[in-house]
Amino acid sequence: MAEQKKKVSPRRRARECAVQALYSWAVSNNDATEIELSFITEQDMKGVDTPYFRKLFRNTVTYLESVDVTIAPFLDRTSEELTPIEKAVLRLATYELKYEPDVPYKVAINEAIELAKTFGAEDSHKYINGVLDKIAPALGRK
Protein backbone atom coordinates (compact mmCIF):
# COMPACT_ATOMS: atom_id res chain seq x y z
CA MET A 1 0.00 0.00 0.00
CA ALA A 2 1.42 3.37 -1.01
CA GLU A 3 2.05 5.87 1.76
CA GLN A 4 -0.29 8.84 1.43
CA LYS A 5 1.25 12.27 1.69
CA LYS A 6 -0.65 14.47 4.12
CA LYS A 7 -2.23 17.40 2.32
CA VAL A 8 -1.18 20.74 3.77
CA SER A 9 -4.07 23.17 4.21
CA PRO A 10 -4.08 26.43 2.23
CA ARG A 11 -4.04 28.36 5.52
CA ARG A 12 -0.96 26.47 6.75
CA ARG A 13 0.74 27.27 3.44
CA ALA A 14 -0.28 30.94 3.89
CA ARG A 15 1.31 30.94 7.34
CA GLU A 16 4.48 29.30 5.99
CA CYS A 17 4.74 31.97 3.31
CA ALA A 18 3.98 34.75 5.80
CA VAL A 19 6.77 33.58 8.14
CA GLN A 20 9.19 33.44 5.22
CA ALA A 21 8.15 36.91 4.08
CA LEU A 22 8.44 38.32 7.63
CA TYR A 23 11.90 36.76 7.89
CA SER A 24 12.94 38.24 4.55
CA TRP A 25 11.58 41.65 5.53
CA ALA A 26 13.40 41.60 8.88
CA VAL A 27 16.79 40.55 7.54
CA SER A 28 16.75 42.60 4.33
CA ASN A 29 15.21 45.85 5.60
CA ASN A 30 13.46 46.10 2.23
CA ASP A 31 10.05 47.71 1.94
CA ALA A 32 7.26 45.34 3.04
CA THR A 33 5.26 46.03 -0.12
CA GLU A 34 8.25 45.02 -2.25
CA ILE A 35 8.74 41.85 -0.20
CA GLU A 36 5.07 40.92 -0.57
CA LEU A 37 5.05 41.56 -4.32
CA SER A 38 8.27 39.68 -4.98
CA PHE A 39 7.06 36.82 -2.81
CA ILE A 40 3.81 36.49 -4.75
CA THR A 41 5.48 36.77 -8.15
CA GLU A 42 8.63 34.72 -7.49
CA GLN A 43 7.61 32.01 -5.00
CA ASP A 44 5.57 28.88 -5.53
CA MET A 45 2.17 30.00 -4.28
CA LYS A 46 0.44 26.76 -5.34
CA GLY A 47 -1.96 25.63 -2.64
CA VAL A 48 -1.62 28.89 -0.71
CA ASP A 49 -4.59 30.88 0.57
CA THR A 50 -3.08 34.00 -1.01
CA PRO A 51 -5.56 36.51 0.43
CA TYR A 52 -4.85 35.12 3.91
CA PHE A 53 -1.09 35.27 3.28
CA ARG A 54 -1.41 38.93 2.27
CA LYS A 55 -3.58 39.70 5.30
CA LEU A 56 -1.19 37.97 7.72
CA PHE A 57 1.93 39.59 6.30
CA ARG A 58 0.49 43.10 5.87
CA ASN A 59 -1.23 43.19 9.25
CA THR A 60 1.70 41.72 11.17
CA VAL A 61 3.87 44.47 9.68
CA THR A 62 1.19 47.13 10.30
CA TYR A 63 0.68 46.12 13.94
CA LEU A 64 4.34 45.25 14.53
CA GLU A 65 4.89 47.67 17.41
CA SER A 66 1.81 46.42 19.26
CA VAL A 67 2.74 42.79 18.57
CA ASP A 68 6.31 43.29 19.81
CA VAL A 69 5.08 45.06 22.96
CA THR A 70 2.77 42.10 23.61
CA ILE A 71 5.58 39.56 23.17
CA ALA A 72 8.33 41.32 25.15
CA PRO A 73 7.20 40.61 28.76
CA PHE A 74 7.02 36.87 28.04
CA LEU A 75 10.55 36.46 26.69
CA ASP A 76 13.39 35.21 28.87
CA ARG A 77 15.86 37.15 26.72
CA THR A 78 15.87 40.33 24.67
CA SER A 79 14.11 40.43 21.34
CA GLU A 80 17.50 40.95 19.68
CA GLU A 81 18.65 37.58 21.04
CA LEU A 82 15.86 35.72 19.22
CA THR A 83 16.74 34.21 15.87
CA PRO A 84 15.02 35.96 12.94
CA ILE A 85 12.88 32.84 12.41
CA GLU A 86 11.80 32.68 16.06
CA LYS A 87 10.92 36.35 15.89
CA ALA A 88 8.93 35.88 12.67
CA VAL A 89 6.98 32.91 14.08
CA LEU A 90 6.25 34.67 17.39
CA ARG A 91 5.15 37.83 15.60
CA LEU A 92 2.82 35.97 13.25
CA ALA A 93 1.25 33.86 16.02
CA THR A 94 0.90 36.83 18.35
CA TYR A 95 -0.77 38.82 15.57
CA GLU A 96 -3.26 35.96 15.10
CA LEU A 97 -3.87 35.63 18.84
CA LYS A 98 -4.37 39.36 19.28
CA TYR A 99 -6.18 40.43 16.10
CA GLU A 100 -7.83 37.32 14.62
CA PRO A 101 -10.49 36.21 17.13
CA ASP A 102 -11.94 33.75 14.59
CA VAL A 103 -8.71 31.72 14.77
CA PRO A 104 -8.92 29.50 17.87
CA TYR A 105 -5.94 30.08 20.16
CA LYS A 106 -5.02 26.38 20.04
CA VAL A 107 -4.83 26.57 16.25
CA ALA A 108 -2.63 29.68 16.33
CA ILE A 109 -0.27 28.07 18.84
CA ASN A 110 -0.17 24.68 17.09
CA GLU A 111 0.48 26.30 13.73
CA ALA A 112 3.33 28.32 15.26
CA ILE A 113 4.85 25.16 16.74
CA GLU A 114 4.70 23.46 13.34
CA LEU A 115 6.26 26.51 11.65
CA ALA A 116 9.07 26.51 14.21
CA LYS A 117 9.65 22.79 13.59
CA THR A 118 9.80 23.42 9.85
CA PHE A 119 11.93 26.57 9.77
CA GLY A 120 13.51 26.97 13.20
CA ALA A 121 16.43 25.49 15.09
CA GLU A 122 16.10 22.03 16.62
CA ASP A 123 14.31 22.95 19.85
CA SER A 124 12.92 26.37 18.94
CA HIS A 125 9.39 24.95 18.76
CA LYS A 126 9.53 24.27 22.51
CA TYR A 127 10.52 27.87 23.22
CA ILE A 128 7.81 29.21 20.87
CA ASN A 129 5.22 27.01 22.60
CA GLY A 130 6.27 28.23 26.05
CA VAL A 131 6.08 31.89 25.09
CA LEU A 132 2.73 31.58 23.29
CA ASP A 133 1.26 29.55 26.16
CA LYS A 134 1.84 32.64 28.33
CA ILE A 135 0.69 35.21 25.75
CA ALA A 136 -2.67 33.54 24.96
CA PRO A 137 -4.14 33.84 28.49
CA ALA A 138 -2.76 37.37 28.84
CA LEU A 139 -4.83 38.25 25.77
CA GLY A 140 -7.89 36.49 27.19
CA ARG A 141 -7.61 33.67 24.65
CA LYS A 142 -7.52 30.68 27.06
Curated annotation (Swiss-Prot):
Disulfide bond annotation, renumbered to this chain: none
GO BP annotation list: DNA-templated transcription termination; transcription antitermination
Any matching Pfam family: NusB
UniProt GO molecular function: RNA binding
Keywords associated with the record: RNA-binding, Transcription, Transcription antitermination, Transcription regulation
A cellular component annotation (GO) from this entry: cytosol
UniProt xrefs under InterPro entries: NusB-like_sf, NusB_fam, NusB_RsmB_TIM44
Function per UniProt: Involved in transcription antitermination. Required for transcription of ribosomal RNA (rRNA) genes. Binds specifically to the boxA antiterminator sequence of the ribosomal RNA (rrn) operons.
NCBIfam families: nusB
Cited HAMAP family: NusB
Family as reported in the entry's similarity comment: Belongs to the NusB family.
Name this polypeptide is given: Transcription antitermination protein NusB
Gene expressing this chain: nusB
